[in-house]
Amino acid sequence: EMCIRDRGILYKREIKDWEGAGWSVGIHASNLGPKIKYLTSKEALPAMVKVGGAADLPFASMHRLTLTADLGYRLSPDDVQALNVSAGAEYAWMEHLMLRGGYHYGDKNKGDASYATAGAGVEYAGVHLDFAWMFAGHECLARNTFWISLGYSF
């Protein structure tokens, strides 16, 4: 029997005297649990601990800027430990059109590539369509990856 767990906690607050503005901080741990059986051997998943924060900053009547950052630490079973840092921003117009960008710094000597992302999204009546593209160097196997998602919020 196997059970891999993720755990996290998020703390959110409003910014006084700034309607709609707020900030949040959180911590998250993933891949917690025993080794998993793969073919004929058992392997441990690399655990990850992340701490991060975000600020939602509305400006004018129809615009919002969200800024995010996080710091991650990978704990591999083979004693390869790696630190990574990510930061991003999202601009929203009327909460219907979003433009996004971000950067992830990872130590390529420890198997964690650095890359930038750019994306956009549209939302109407709870339906959202999002698109993103990863820009990375040749050392990153996931370079030039595209993501498309369609969802519904209720």
Identify the residue ranges that each predicted region occupies.
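Outer-membrane beta-barrel porins/channels
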Residues: 1, 5-154
